[in-house]
Amino acid sequence: MEKTMRHGITATILLCCSVSAFATTPQIIAHRAGTGDAPENTEYAISKSLENKADAIWITVQLSKDGIPVLYRPSDLNSLTNKSGPVSAYKAKQLAKFDAGYKFSSDSDHPFRNKGLGIPTLEQVLKKYPDTFFYIDLKSPDADPAQQAKELEKVLAKQKAFTRTRFYSTDEAYLNALPKEIQRFESRDKTRTMLANITMAHQCDIPANTDTARWYGLEMRRNVEVVEKYTLGEARSKSVLTWDNEAMKCFRAKSGANITLFGIKTEEDFKQAKELGADGVLVDSPKLFSTFKTN
């Protein structure tokens, strides 16, 4: 009896180890083209991230004054460059001459100033990296959704890039305006609401007829404020939305779910994402995470 139990315990341990050892390794996605290693959203950053074995590149796009999709994130050029004002105030050819590495610092130094790192267009990037998959975050603070969708479709068609791009935005209007041919994530609001219902009410709200491929993206952990309304007022409390096994099971209750976790900062984060079975992780430094991927 004792011998049998000992063998059973050994088998259980081996089984657990096997599951952990063969967990799917998430796709390493370079956030803002690898903002932790180089000036964000530049061709230089893309090249470095690919050298550091990133599986895909996440870039941020806005529309220039002449309606050309360009790679830039903040609402003011002063945040990252040697110029100021919104991206939409300048033509793409002007933006290409601005110093996109001006504000990037390393140990109180600015190693990328005056190195010729301009703001590239989406078309230039897709053409230069024909074998790379790009996740494209739409960040224009003032673009017309319909016009932006038209310009994006034009670029993707010219570069034959419909199958190697997928779009994301915190503004659902930008996603809704995209034509059917353009791949996209589910809306952030929808994803957050589903996760909140799982975390707080243990309620799984996957529609019964959901059986198509779909992509979800959200922070692995996110602080939120819960507002409860009553007849005589309301109550506010802090909470944390967290991806766990219950959440993963719910989101994958129907086939076709692909889950990308944001805000992965440490090796522990990466291990947790891997154990959860995440399909992708958004990281600032592919250089750092390439070492974790092989562990």
Which role does the model predict for each range below?
Residues 18-20:
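N-terminal signal peptide c-region/cleavage motif recognized by signal peptidases
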